[in-house]
Design a protein with these regions (language model features):
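Detector for C-terminal structural segments
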Residues: 48, 60-67, 317, 321-322, ...
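Gly/Pro-rich hinge or "lid" segments in bacterial periplasmic/extracellular proteins
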Residues: 78, 256, 262-312, 317-323, ...
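Append "and occasionally in soluble cytosolic enzymes with long acidic Gly/Pro-rich linkers
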Residues: 377, 385-387, 484-616, 753-754
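N-terminal lobe/hinge region of extracytoplasmic solute-binding protein
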Residues: 43-116
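Extracytoplasmic/peripheral linker and loop segments enriched in polar/acidic and small residues
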Residues: 155, 202-217, 221-250, 254, ...
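Ligand-site clamp/hinge motif
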Residues: 364, 382, 389-439
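Periplasmic binding protein-like
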Residues: 42, 134, 416, 421-426, ...
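Aromatic- and charge-enriched surface segment that lines or borders ligand/interaction sites
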Residues: 107-278, 415, 482-485, 489-492
Length: 755
């Protein structure tokens, strides 16, 4: 289901790649030249498939394994900002949370925007990188990897082929994978000049149905791993229903999906774009269908990939793309291992494999090799065994062995206590916090104690945020949902709800969540900070633009001030206000509203009691505001996707780049607020078109202020996730400081120590 996938969870795998694959934190010059004779056991999500290649890993768990073995060109910092100047011995120092941190990278990247609209990305890598097998890395390895990702038959998870790289379209032209040609031609095709009739029949009767079933199974597995505990899922049918389809098993789910999309797999709103959890349908096909078929002429190389030295290259794009820089965090993978060195000759347009045939690369998928902090040794019985790489660029890890063990959600905390694992990342809420407190010998009232004799808990901001949305087409005055009167109506309601956020979010989360005031996750570098000029608490000014609250006000006084300010907004919206109440509504306005919330039908949601309180207060001044608690999350999603919800409570996922197009642009695919504002659209496009981060941050703040002025979204909370470690076995002092979703416990794995 589109919203469930994209809004709540799809970014998790990407984040893990960025934080684990670029394990480049504090520089360690050795000290203890021999790795400590210790083994660290870390939990990993169930779903290992043994596909550990940096090119073809599919599941989140497999991708994480690849990240420990592979060295990437550069990491992102604690706010997800690429580290582009960290190659030198002194690294690159950046401030976070009032502290300076130094980041190291395998390569530097310089970005230059040209007057003609083209962009140069000049990359220079270190000349002392050595793979764990002793061979030396050069820029040819990076070029090899680029051509793997950009091959016409590439069917992994990377999407570099969608970027505006000069000459890419010409290179990929004239060849297509067999499955693509068969799919486009259709089941009734009669032209068998490029394939046989038997091949076509086999594709439609066996190949595609089997791939579809595997695709559906990947969704089921993804849902059960990530959401079984939160949603009380017990069977595959439960997972299928949560994703929004019918069926008792994967085959039936695929039939339901295929029917719902009328067979549209590759369209902009097709199955691959909308439903994929961690892989596309095509990634599930038999390899026989991925072979490249020549259909015409094509370029021999990609003109925008230019080798400029043994350790440098330039990538040229035809225009600026804000996501391009993140895609350049590339694996430095040995071409001689993953490809064929005899097939590499840059000057003669040979790039380590035969164009259209990636079989040699895929043959190494189960046994990765790289220059990362650890060396792959084995995978069996749900455990990946890795050993310290003495040739690692930042120094040999102090932990000799790292075991990554599949662990169910229910066994993560108990596993750390029992000693079967040392580090885990369980889902986090007050019940889990109380479980951890009990294991540490604390009382239930001491659940906010994070450090104990058995377990240490490190909280990390969740890559996303909770919010309340408003449909302006249903909460308006007259026929214009964007008139000042309509805005004031929505602002009045938001003012009432906003003042209670601190109290009710704290009562649900304690100090494991914080109130936010802009529609963006605090994890983003673009998020306004309280110290920034012009920072404001959401809906804290009255209809005349004056502050509603003062620092001296008590909580009760703030509540009273909010009601007074809200009445001012309602009056400006055309309501009749007398004796502290709305006594009459503008013509055509009923002043009866409902908020949709997915609290399981039991009220278990961080915003449920807040919405109930809002209904009570609004009711006391003449406005009906009721809460509708959905037992099934899919039903909630449907209400705001189909435009029937007036108000709803949900959560957005956050991407590494803060691009606002999808959610707020007039043409955004998930613009559920139906905003169509030229000024806002222009700001969003300006933000997309610049590499200047301070400029983009200012642009996005202006855009967010427009959104808040429309009164269509009330930012609510930034919640936390957690990492739980054994206090008895792990040296907690060697963890990275100020961990974030982008810089987790493994970001400086080479300096982590056991006791």
């Amino acid at each position: 289901m589109k919203n469930f996938k994209k809004v709540l969870a799809v970014l998790l795998a990407v984040v893990m790649v960025l934080s684990l694959a670029a394990c480049t934190g504090k520089k360690d010059d050795g000290g203890d030249k021999g790795a400590a004779k210790k083994t660290l056991v870390a939990s990993i999500e169930q779903g290992l498939e043994g596909k550990f290649s940096p090119f073809f890993s599919l599941s989140q768990s497999d991708t994480n394994v690849a990240g420990f073995v592979t060295l990437y060109t550069f990491p992102v910092d604690r706010v997800g900002n690429p580290v582009l100047k960290g190659m030198g011995k002194d690294g690159e120092t950046r401030s976070y949370n009032g502290k300076d941190y130094t980041y190291y990278a395998a390569a530097n990247v310089e970005v230059k925007q040209n007057d003609d609209g083209t962009v140069y990305y000049d990359m220079t890598m270190r000349d002392d990188i050595v793979y764990s097998d002793g061979t030396k890395a050069t820029i040819d390895d990076v070029i090899f990897g680029l051509y793997v990702y950009l091959d016409p038959t590439y069917d992994g998870n990377a999407t570099m082929y969608s970027l505006p790289i000069e000459g890419l379209e010409e290179y990929r032209a004239g060849m297509a994978p067999l499955y693509q040609l068969l799919y486009v031609a259709g089941e009734d095709n009669t032209d068998f000049s490029l394939w046989t009739e038997d091949q076509q029949k086999a594709f439609w009767t066996e190949g595609l149905p089997k791939a579809g079933e595997a695709f559906a199974q990947s969704i089921i597995d993804y849902v059960m791993i990530n959401y079984a505990a939160a949603y009380g899922l017990e069977t595959e049918a439960d997972a299928i229903e949560l994703w929004g389809f019918s069926g008792e098993n994967a085959a039936e789910m695929w039939a339901s999906i295929y029917d719902a999309y009328k067979g549209d797999i590759d369209g902009e709103e097709g199955i691959n774009e909308t439903e994929a959890a961690d892989r596309t349908v095509w990634a599930c096909l038999d390899p026989a269908y991925t072979v490249g078929i020549k259909t015409g002429e094509s370029a021999a190389n990609i003109t925008g990939i230019q080798k400029t030295g043994d350790y440098s290259l330039r990538i040229v794009t035809t225009k600026f793309d804000a996501t391009m820089i993140y895609q350049l965090s590339l694996p430095i993978a040995p071409m001689a291992y993953y490809g064929d060195a005899s097939l590499y000759n840059y000057e003669n347009n040979q790039f380590g494999f035969t164009k259209g045939d990636l079989s040699i690369v895929k043959s190494k998928t189960t046994t990765p090799l790289g220059a990362g902090p650890f060396v792959f040794k084995s995978y069996e019985n749900g455990t990946v065994h890795l050993e310290a790489n003495p040739k690692y660029l930042l120094g040999e890890p102090k932990i000799a062995n790292l075991d990554l063990r599949e662990t169910s959600e229910a066994n993560k905390v108990s596993g750390v206590v029992a000693g079967t694992i040392d580090i885990a990342d369980p889902s986090y809420d007050t019940d889990r916090a109380k479980e951890i407190a009990a294991q540490n010998g604390f009382s239930a009232d001491e659940w906010e104690k994070f450090d104990g004799p058995k377990l240490t808990t490190k909280l990390i901001d969740y890559l996303g945020y909770g919010y309340m949305g408003i449909n302006p087409n249903l909460v308006k005055v007259g026929n214009d949902p964007y008139s000042d009167a309509s805005k004031n109506l929505r602002k009045g309601i938001n003012t009432i709800i906003s003042v209670y956020r601190d109290e009710y979010i704290d009562s649900y989360y304690g100090n494991t969540a914080s109130v936010i005031n802009y529609p963006i996750s605090n994890t983003s570098w673009a998020a306004p900070q309280t110290t920034d000029d012009g920072y404001q608490i959401a809906y804290s000014k009255d209809v005349n633009g004056n502050p509603i609250y003062t620092a001296e006000m008590t909580v009760e006084q703030k509540h009273e001030a909010a009601v007074k300010a809200a009445l001012g907004f309602f009056e400006a919206a055309g309501c009749t206000v007398a004796d502290g109440k709305v006594t009459a509504a503008p013509a055509g306005v009923e002043l009866k509203y409902q908020v949709e919330i997915g609290a399981g039908g039991t009220g278990d949601h961080p915003l449920y009691l807040l919405m109930q309180k809002a209904g009570e207060v609004l009711g006391s001044i003449g406005i009906t505001f009721t809460v509708n608690d959905w037992a099934n999350a899919n039903d909630l999603y449907a209400t705001y996707q189909n435009g029937t919800a007036q108000f709803w409570c949900a959560a957005w996922g956050a991407a590494t780049d803060p691009d606002m197009y999808q959610l707020y642009h007039s043409n955004g695919s998930t613009n559920y607020y139906h905003i169509s504002d030229k000024e806002l659209d222009d700001l969003i496009m300006k933000g997309r078109a610049s590499a200047d981060q301070p400029y983009r941050k200012a642009i996005y703040k202006s855009a967010m202020e427009i959104i808040l002025d429309y009164g269509v979204e009330l930012p609510m909370y930034q919640r936390s996730e957690c990492t739980v470690l054994s206090t008895e076995r792990v040296n907690i002092d060697t963890l990275p400081g100020d961990m974030t979703p982008y810089w987790g416990w493994a970001a400086e794995i080479h300096t982590l120590e056991m006791k």
